[in-house]
Amino acid sequence: MRLPYSWLREVVAVGASGWDVTPGELEQTLLRIGHEVEEVIPLGPVDGPVTVGRVADIEELTGYKKPIRACAVDIGDRQYREIICGATNFAVGDLVVVALPGATLPGGFTISARKAYGRNSDGMICSAAELNLGADHSGILVLPPGAAEPGADGAGVLGLDDVVFHLAITPDRGYCMSVRGLARELACAYDLDFVDPASNSRVPPLPIEGPAWPLTVQPETGVRRFALRPVIGIDPAAVSPWWLQRRLLLCGIRATCPAVDVTNYVMLELGHPMHAHDRNRISGTLGVRFARSGETAVTLDGIERKLDTADVLIVDDAATAAIGGVMGAASTEVRADSTDVLLEAAIWDPAAVSRTQRRLHLPSEAARRYERTVDPAISVAALDRCARLLADIAGGEVSPTLTDWRGDPPCDDWSPPPIRMGVDVPDRIAGVAYPQGTTARRLAQIGAVVTHDGDTLTVTPPSWRPDLRQPADLVEEVLRLEGLEVIPSVLPPAPAGRGLTAGQQRRRTIGRSLALSGYVEILPTPFLPAGVFDLWGLEADDSRRMTTRVLNPLEADRPQLATTLLPALLEALVRNVSRGLVDVALFAIAQVVQPTEQTRGVGLIPVDRRPTDDEIAMLDASLPRQPQHVAAVLAGLREPRGPWGPGRPVEAADAFEAVRIIARASRVDVTLRPAQYLPWHPGRCAQVFVGESSVGHAGQLHPAVIERSGLPKGTCAVELNLDAIPCSAPLPAPRVSPYPAVFQDVSLVVAADIPAQAVADAVRAGAGDLLEDIALFDVFTGPQIGEHRKSLTFALRFRAPDRTLTEDDASAARDAAVQSAAERVGAVLRG
């Protein structure tokens, strides 16, 4: 949000005459009380002659690819300057800002007289962006009539000695998206009296003699308040004054017409969005309801938008008048000939506004405020302020009628529920002995009503602070306003014996091992892409299709929480490949969400007491399983090309090796068995077992899945359930034999469908305790071996703990291993 320093200072000074601080000090104060200042933008600076001019004549120059105009500009005392300009948004008689030769504009751009398009250009007519007044550079800055006389100092008229603060307002502090809210914060920070610009003393109530317009509201829409007031007989030719246009411009809003400008101005001033309808274009009764299936509406930007049944609308008897809290509709738009206006101020459901504006891709200043909640107590005050301002600017008469729907039954007290808190709670939490009365004083400053009952405070938060719900929220306010810098920095003692759990240690070890093996870790999104399981071809009853839906998702097309990590990894793989990174190895360690038959939604439990054991048991039973998974994907070359050769493409064996890396890091033994499990290739997929428990799958992905998902050919993947892998106890240090090892190789021919792991297990069982290690280093197939046969060559390492082995000892163990393999898997020693 952007706000000018001069406007903030003016509102704060109403309650503290003479108050004045520098913009730099104000920036530090805002940061100190918890508001992030993204940027401080000084207007200008300009150096040299910048003046106000009136366009006396315009000559259109032809023969060029774009519009070019030679303008005669009166800069005072009938001094005319010819200036060449490419903008077309001004006419003869308009007041403009002219930078004369010798002037230096923001960015160090110096103006000089020059020849352009065959004419002499003696200066430049400036846009708002060129003067650092805003980002709009689509046309030059046109001042409203009466803003100044030709020859007046441009810097003074524009107020270029001002500063604009660009703040990032957090979602829980919607009240600060206004001058009213930020001025109150500054008054608290400086211990000043604050005069609320929405109070009766500043906005005297207008008379009410009857309802302004017939209205019906569907209670289920979540609307809390809906107010209407007409302004009759405004001048369609009226223009907003420069002081108002300037403030809108500095806040990033373009001025259009008085009816729209005053609603935007009051929104910035008081924080309450409003909308202006053309009263003469409304047909019959206004109503608030949900959109119907298939219904559409043409919004103010001229686009017809398809609505959802969750969208809340303002409608009349003929058409949609607005999408509630998001944008008005074209049917009741205020136009150039509008004379009667119906002003509307409503309080919409924040979740509904957020959902609608995201789905329609219609972010707006009003929606940003409604998402963060708006003060319902000032709806009529904001409406009266807007109506009075519009009548002052554009003439007309404020109708003495008002429609103010406040729910059924009507609500008269908009304050959140009161909170009880011990007076010393902030002191105990902060470890600071605040002066007596500090807590009550600070809470009163933020607008709360505070009453004492011995050592207990009863605090009723103000209507604009729905975020204050429990004592901890009140403590935060006291600590923030007193200054976080006074809280002592004390490092909490770490109790002996505490540290990472076995599961945390294992996850770190696995991540480190995969990273050292060439994998790059990503943080996966917890949501499933739409239709991913259809791309994989999963059966309708596949357990991975049983997902948990989020009611208010970050993305409308991704409401389901992930039951597997692979979709997120495969999306990251596709993005990397599309950007030229074709040799990719990624992994992720994260939770997945797997609902059960008992998973269900439960109501909120009150936070003012400890939950009962039954309530805790109910909550635990309602939660879905959330096991930790580890997953990896590989594509491209696993071994890079170079002088040694063309490189080795990724294959299923690399996925199996990733399983072994994870197993070694987990200190468990795994067994790989052939399996058929989508999205893996049925002939190149292994099911991973620890003991007799299945913990996941690995291998090459199915060619059809690869093609439909746009993945590189031969993509491989692994996914294991870490929670299904037991955390082993710390391994004792092994006894290291001081005797040398004996190395021998053995080649065994087996049927092509026999897993290499089964052969290795048979060899290990036959060789006995002398076999220290076995490693497969060659697989050979060909006519020499026979059809449907393969040759597996293993490197064997023998060692005894108590003596030096002879070749005969090793050969005997090797022969026993061959015999065992022959008996178990039908292996034949290759000659």
Curated annotation (Swiss-Prot):
Record bears the keyword Acetylation: no
B5 domain mapped to chain residues: 414-489
Cited Pfam families: B3_4, B5, FDX-ACB, tRNA_bind, tRNA_synthFbeta
Sorted UniProt keywords: Aminoacyl-tRNA synthetase, ATP-binding, Cytoplasm, Ligase, Magnesium, Metal-binding, Nucleotide-binding, Protein biosynthesis, RNA-binding, tRNA-binding
Cofactor(s) needed by this chain: Mg(2+)
Co-factor binding details: Binds 2 magnesium ions per tetramer.
Catalytic reaction list: tRNA(Phe) + L-phenylalanine + ATP = L-phenylalanyl-tRNA(Phe) + AMP + diphosphate + H(+)
Domain spans labelled tRNA-binding: 44-155
EC assignment: 6.1.1.20
GO molecular function: ATP binding; magnesium ion binding; phenylalanine-tRNA ligase activity; tRNA binding
Protein location: Cytoplasm
Any Gene Ontology biological process: phenylalanyl-tRNA aminoacylation
Binding-site positions, Mg(2+): 467, 473, 476-477
Cellular component, GO annotation: peptidoglycan-based cell wall; phenylalanine-tRNA ligase complex; plasma membrane
Entry's family note: Belongs to the phenylalanyl-tRNA synthetase beta subunit family. Type 1 subfamily.
General remark: Was identified as a high-confidence drug target.
PANTHER family in alphabetical order: PHENYLALANINE--TRNA LIGASE BETA SUBUNIT (PTHR10947:SF0), PHENYLALANYL-TRNA SYNTHETASE BETA CHAIN AND LEUCINE-RICH REPEAT-CONTAINING PROTEIN 47 (PTHR10947)
Protein name in the entry: Phenylalanine--tRNA ligase beta subunit
Organism annotation: Mycobacterium tuberculosis (strain ATCC 25618 / H37Rv)
Taxonomic classification: Bacteria, Bacillati, Actinomycetota, Actinomycetes, Mycobacteriales
